[in-house]
Amino acid sequence: DDLRIAYSEHALFAPFREGWSFQLRLANRRSTMLVEAEARLMLVMADVDDQGELLNYYNLKLQLDRVSFLPLSWTLVHPIDGDSPLAGISYDEMVQRRAEVILVLKGTDEGYMQQVITRHSYRYDEMVWGARYIRAFSARKGSMQLDLDKLSDHQRVEAPERMPNGQGVLA
């Protein structure tokens, strides 16, 4: 992990608009800005067939996958809709299939004009089923301040046993 990027300790299955989403938070610890930041999430899950175990890889489409600049923090949101590989899944299935979500973040350090690529992952036991992040900002002296100690803060919310299957129906 790149020590200049901070990541939330847990990724969350969180309410989003009228449905649910998979979310994680990251923050820029640098004194310089990260520009043209781009994020990709990949879900890896194990399946068993007659040949044995195999790993399946799925792209998780983000609500917003790039920002022109990352001055403070960014909450990455994958809406769980009918096209999501997480549609209809339960937490027990995530555990059984040893789910892991891998984040790849690319950007350019504005101060040094040097490309930054960093990876971070969340295993099933680092995911919280039914929670939402608590705001990590406060307004001080007329400007927004990020409190890195609050980057991972979340509160539990009631969640369905399974994520919606995309038809607005719980599977």
What are these regions (language model features)?
Residues 1-56:
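Canonical alpha-helical transmembrane segment with a positive-inside/aromatic-interface signature
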Residues 10-15, 29, 44-46, 106-110, ...:
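Generic structural motif
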Residues 45-48, 61-73, 122-136:
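Short, surface-exposed linear segments at secondary-structure transitions and domain or protein termini
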Residues 48-51, 64-69, 81-85, 141-150:
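Noncatalytic linker/hinge segments flanking ATPase motor cores
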Residues 55-95, 107-114:
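Extended, solvent-exposed segments with strong compositional bias
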Residues 96-100:
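Extracellular Ig-like/FN3 beta-sandwich strand-entry sites
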Residues 111-171:
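Acidic, serine/threonine- and proline-rich intrinsically disordered appendage/tail regions
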